[in-house]
Curated annotation (Swiss-Prot):
GO biological process: RNA polymerase II transcription initiation surveillance; snRNA processing
Subcellular location as annotated: Nucleus; Cytoplasm
Role according to the record: Component of the integrator complex, a multiprotein complex that terminates RNA polymerase II (Pol II) transcription in the promoter-proximal region of genes. The integrator complex provides a quality checkpoint during transcription elongation by driving premature transcription termination of transcripts that are unfavorably configured for transcriptional elongation: the complex terminates transcription by (1) catalyzing dephosphorylation of the C-terminal domain (CTD) of Pol II subunit Polr2A/Rbp1 and Spt5, and (2) degrading the exiting nascent RNA transcript via endonuclease activity.
Keywords: Cytoplasm, Nucleus, Phosphoprotein
Protein name, per record: Integrator complex subunit 3
Domain of life: Eukaryota
Organism, as annotated: Drosophila melanogaster (Fruit fly)
Phosphoserine PTM positions: 1038-1039, 1043-1044
GO cellular component: cytoplasm; Golgi apparatus; INTAC complex; integrator complex; nucleus
Residue ranges of the region described as Disordered: 916-939, 1000-1068
Assembly notes: Belongs to the multiprotein complex Integrator, at least composed of IntS1, IntS2, IntS3, IntS4, omd/IntS5, IntS6, defl/IntS7, IntS8, IntS9, IntS10, IntS11, IntS12, asun/IntS13, IntS14 and IntS15. The core complex associates with protein phosphatase 2A subunits mts/PP2A and Pp2A-29B, to form the Integrator-PP2A (INTAC) complex.
Length: 1068
């Protein structure tokens, strides 16, 4: 008994609400374990002892995470200790609290509903602290909190979260406006939430929301424009609020007042709203449930799941507004794969039909129907996705037989919305609806519209309305089945999805009273609308097992059938295509391939098809063969896990290349002879219909060669780049462009496979891949530390060569625009290739300290291992020197001075001397042996600038030996004598380091060459041998702010130089 009691007590959590039947999951265990571990570590310690102990402990990755989670647990469960704990965690965190933010984001997304009341309030406090101190990535936590602020929910718990977030946004408005995506999400969410807060008891909250949202929309309208058409749909639901009514007037009347780039309402309506904004209006838990329903529940078994969903989320009157959010999410976000479309999983149209037919609120029902047909109104076949209009036609088509009330309601709504949604631009709306219906027929989503539009189950008034609106679709259509054979391009089913980009169209300003832009929630005509609310018995029978079975039966079109559309689309198309007679040589093998759809029958057909000349086919026959083969090859490819789970096990490797498309690659690998024109045409159409063919071929050759080599170790199997070239020729693209595009697609699809293939790519496509900046960028953007390590291993073992010396500098020059992490990885790879400095040193003058810190850091490390040479010094001193100097050049000179002081001094002196004419007309100065004078040497001012900034870096005499050598002394004296007054004044402290020479030097004699005050030419001639006191020169030209340290350094240098000269004279 005591044991049971202790077990129950152990399960009590301060962070999560736990019922008697709940068990701790891994997340809860992790948080509580980290809290207990932290308490054991810091118990009884003073603040200083705790900080010292934790500072050492966080150096280990695992302990750092445990400590971070432990602190997070305390801040969420103990309000009295929260402030002190926040201070402690800022002191010991070594990742800018990134670990805490990451765990908090996960906690909000996955466990918010289970948090205790105290934890929810502390969460808001912690968010406020994070925003106040601008902690990185806090916007991710905010976005997930916005998702938890559910629509259709006016419970006190939900209202607390909404108002708390609103207060944070108002208080930290400046921070909010720095993140455009968060601005967009906030506006989209609050416009949606305002709709639910019409209760007079919520008037104060609603006014606060309206004031904040309107202000944010007007001041940040350029960020609001990308919200697109669904933002307009939400604005319609709040159009009766005075502030939003005025906003509507500005949008329609005076769009330029909102933003200079805004051209009116049509610009918004032709921008597809991003999936993320549609997603943010569903609770994460609700999203998981509806996604499970659409991906894992079999058609016919869905009723119990729908009943649970109804009781959970549609229990209150306010919750009916959620139906529109769900329908928009299902239509735009849940796009089933080919495998799912061909399976018995409940289709999207059935879920949407249930959401609409079970709605008992007239306004919510009208809004739900608008959500279903919203994309129809602005549909552009060239840019929009057919998956967004498919559910609308299918729910009507499948319901007309057993549930005509659903089809009648939706058809009536479609007819009326086409005419009344935007009266002034009815023609544009009608074009969008016509485009939708036309593409639906062309893509064979349904065979034809007659069973729907001319059904005897529709009342006469509705049939007349349909006839008035869709007259073009009522006459018997042309043989749409033949469309498949009239073009060389195969018809891609609507299952081949592609995302549409944002579109912007322009329109004139519209008069508010003439536009006819209807407000669904405010202008419903109760007398005219057709709203058939089914009985409970009808609701239970909607899309039941019996209906599902009936929908699968095959009937003739004259029998008013709608059942074919529940079959996989590919089977429907094949069944409805007219039989085409083919040449005897391929008829049998083609039929076998169409029936069995496997690699064996496919390769047998290719063997028969390849040698056939163009004369063996009529055009419609070739089109028939091509369209069917492309469709089957596409549909037989798996949508997920297309690559092998293992890179070593033969079973997994062989299975991953067992699909028919790989049969084509195998056939090409084993047959090198030239193909006839029909086969080339087939190959070209396959390339167009399956964009992934390029990287799948590369993957196939890697696996195939690996497996064949294992089977027959006596024979070597290698990549055949000729096959890839054949694919590129079929696609009519250059091999370099094809390779980059395919590798880019592969990296986005599966980074591990991309990196696995990388050594083979660089080996087999050496001329294209080596020093290729685009390929390098694709590689660098996806690698982490472990990947960099593996790449370095491959380079060290000679398996991978990414760079060659010739042309590498151009590659590095282009990489200067890469992200910081990418550049650091790049320099590690360059270093692994043992590239000599001479191959890349010419870029040194181009590097800027502010723009290229990564490259300069690496060059500095390279220079530490090199001796100074004339060429390197010339390039370094050619760098532009800013007012504060060039720390890169100064650093290099400092560490070279420690080992190569005399050599460095001579090289720089030679460069400086070469900028001035010879002092004696009868003598010609020559640089020391081994030092050549380049035509692209730095200017005298550049050299003097760098020497001056180097001098300033010297303190207490350290590093000043550079100036005491004879050549440097003579160079500085020569520079001084040939400089104008402004230059002498600018570098007076530098020139002061040059010691004056005695009148005679050694045995040769001659006039002494000393530094002189600036004077006229006459003065120079008359006093050529006079000596000037260095201190006097210094007094005339030095600046007033020289420090005592600099004076001490210069004095020491002068003394050293004089001693060296005296020693030289004595030796002479």
């Amino acid at each position: 008994m005591e044991q049971q009691q202790s077990k129950n007590n152990a399960h009590v959590s301060k962070l999560f609400i736990c019922t008697a039947v709940d068990c701790k999951d891994d997340i809860e265990e992790k948080f509580e374990r980290s809290f207990v571990t932290l308490q054991m570590q810091i118990s009884g310690l003073s603040d200083k002892e705790m900080h010292d102990m934790l500072s050492q402990a966080v150096c280990k990755e695992k302990q750092h995470e445990e400590i971070s989670i432990g602190f997070l647990y305390i801040m969420l469960t103990d309000p009295s200790m929260a402030s002190k704990t926040y201070r402690d965690v800022t002191l010991v965190s070594r990742d800018g609290m990134n670990g805490i933010v990451t765990n908090l984001t996960f906690l909000v997304a996955e466990k918010y509903t289970k948090l205790t009341e105290v934890a929810r309030r502390q969460l808001i406090w912690l968010l406020r602290e994070f925003v106040k101190h601008q902690v990185l990535s806090v916007e991710n936590v905010i976005w997930n909190c916005l998702r938890q602020a559910g629509g259709g929910d006016v419970s006190s718990r939900n209202l607390f979260l909404i108002e708390s977030l609103l207060d944070i946004f108002i208080e930290f408005r400046t921070w909010l406006e720095t993140n455009p995506f968060l601005v967009q999400s906030t506006v989209y969410s609050f416009v949606r939430l305002i709709e639910d807060h019409a209760n007079p008891a919520l008037l104060s909250l609603r006014q606060k929301e309206v004031k904040f949202t309107i202000s944010l929309i007007r001041e940040r309208f350029h960020d609001i424009i990308p919200l697109g058409r669904d933002f307009v749909r939400l604005l319609q639901n709040v159009a009766r609020i005075p502030e939003f009514e005025q906003l509507w007037r500005d949008i329609l009347f005076n769009p330029k007042m909102l933003h200079q780039t805004f051209n009116g309402i049509w610009q918004l309506l032709h921008i597809r709203t991003s999936r993320r904004f549609l997603q943010c209006r569903l609770l994460p838990e609700m999203e998981r449930k509806i996604s499970f329903l659409a991906s894992s529940v079999k058609f016919g078994n869905q009723k119990r799941y729908q009943d649970w969903f109804q009781d959970k989320y549609f229990a209150t009157p306010e919750s009916h507004s959620l139906r529109s959010d769900l329908i928009r999410f299902i239509i735009n976000v849940i796009h089933p794969t080919n495998d799912m479309l061909c399976s018995d999983i409940i289709p999207r149209w059935a879920i949407i039909g249930w959401l609409i037919s079970s709605c008992t609120n007239p306004i919510a029902s009208a809004n739900a129907k608008l959500s279903l047909f919203y994309d129809w109104l602005f549909f552009d076949p060239a840019k929009d996705n057919i998956m967004n209009i498919e559910p609308g036609i299918l729910v009507m088509y499948h319901s007309i037989r057993n549930h005509p009330f659903v089809s009648s309601t939706l058809l009536d709504f479609l007819c009326r919305i086409t005419k009344n949604f935007f009266v002034k631009h009815e023609d544009k709306i009608r074009i969008g609806v016509y485009n939708s219906l036309k593409l639906i027929l062309e893509k064979q989503v349904i065979p034809n519209l007659q069973p729907l539009f001319e059904s005897p189950k529709l009342d006469r008034e509705l049939r007349n309305l349909i006839r008035d609106n869709f007259r073009e679709f009522l006459s018997p259509p042309a043989n749409h089945g033949q469309l498949l054979f009239t073009s060389l391009h195969p018809v891609q089913g609507h299952i081949l999805k592609k995302e549409s980009d944002q579109r912007i169209l322009h329109c004139e300003n519209m008069d508010l009273h003439e536009t006819g832009l209807i407000n669904i929630s405010g202008t419903i005509d109760e007398d005219k609308k057709i709203l058939l609310v089914p009985t409970d018995q009808e609701i239970e029978s909607v899309f039941s097992d019996e209906t599902a079975e009936n929908l699968r039966r095959v009937h003739n079109i004259e029998d008013n059938t709608d059942d074919d559309d529940d079959l996989p689309l590919s089977e429907v198309r094949l069944k409805e295509k007219p039989k085409v007679e083919l040449a005897e040589a391929i008829a049998e093998s083609f039929d076998a391939f169409v029936t069995k759809r496997n690699s064996y029958t496919w390769e047998a057909f290719l063997k028969d098809f390849r040698p056939l000349p163009a004369s063996a086919f009529e055009e419609f026959q070739l089109n028939y063969v091509i369209s069917n083969t492309v469709l089957i090859l596409r549909e037989t490819l798996p949508q997920q896990n297309i690559f092998s789970e293992s890179k070593t096990e033969e079973k997994h490797l062989a299975k991953s290349i067992s699909y028919p498309l790989y049969g084509l690659f195998r056939f090409l690998y084993e047959n090198d002879e030239k193909s006839k024109k029909p086969f080339q045409t087939l190959l070209s159409e396959i390339c167009e219909g399956i964009p992934e063919i390029g990287y799948l071929l590369l993957y196939f050759m890697k696996i195939y060669c690996k497996l064949q080599t294992r089977k027959n170790s006596q024979q070597s199997y290698q990549f055949k780049t000729t096959i890839y070239r054949q694919i590129c020729d079929a696609a009519d693209e250059k091999i370099g462009n094809c390779l980059l595009r395919d590798l880019d697609l592969l990296e986005k699809e599966n980074t591990n496979i991309f990196l696995w293939l990388l050594p083979d790519i660089y080996r087999e496509f050496k001329s294209i891949a080596t020093n290729n900046t685009d390929l390098l960028r694709i590689t660098l953007r996806c690698i982490d530390a472990k990947n960099v390590r593996d790449i370095l291993y491959s380079i060290a073992q000679g398996k991978l060569t990414i760079f060659k010396q010739d042309g590498l500098i151009d590659c590095i020059r282009q990489s200067l625009e890469f992200e910081t992490y990418e550049q650091f990885c790049l320099w590690q790879i360059v270093q692994a290739h043992d590239v000599p400095l001479r191959c890349i040193q010419d870029i040194l003058p181009e590097l800027e300290a502010g723009s290229h810190p990564e490259a300069l850091s690496h060059f500095l490390l390279l220079l530490k291992n090199e001796e100074p040479t004339n060429e390197i010094i010339r390039l370094m001193l050619s760098r532009e020197s800013k007012s504060k100097g060039d720390p890169f050049v100064t650093s290099a000179l400092r560490f070279w001075c420690q080992r190569y002081e005399e050599k460095l001094s001579e090289i720089i002196a030679s460069l400086l001397t070469s900028k001035y004419p010879s002092s004696s007309p009868n003598k010609r100065k020559r640089p020391p042996k081994g030092i050549s004078v380049s035509t692209s040497t730095p200017s005298a001012d550049q050299v003097l600038n760098h020497l001056e900034h180097y001098r300033r870096s010297c303190r207490h005499g350290t590093g000043t030996g550079l100036y005491v050598h004879d050549m440097m002394q003579r160079a500085l004296q020569s520079a001084y004598s040939h400089s104008n007054d402004s230059t002498k004044k600018q570098f007076c402290d530098l020139f002061a380091l040059a010691a004056e020479e005695d009148t005679t030097v050694g045995r040769r004699g001659g006039s002494g060459r000393g530094r002189k005050q600036p004077g006229s030419k006459k003065d120079v001639n008359n006093h050529g041998t006079s000596k000037k006191n260095p201190e006097m020169v210094k007094t005339i030209y030095s600046s007033d702010d020289n420090s005592s340290e600099e004076d001490w350094s210069k004095s020491k240098i002068l003394q050293t130089a004089k001693r060296r000269k005296k020693a030289n004279n004595d030796s002479d």
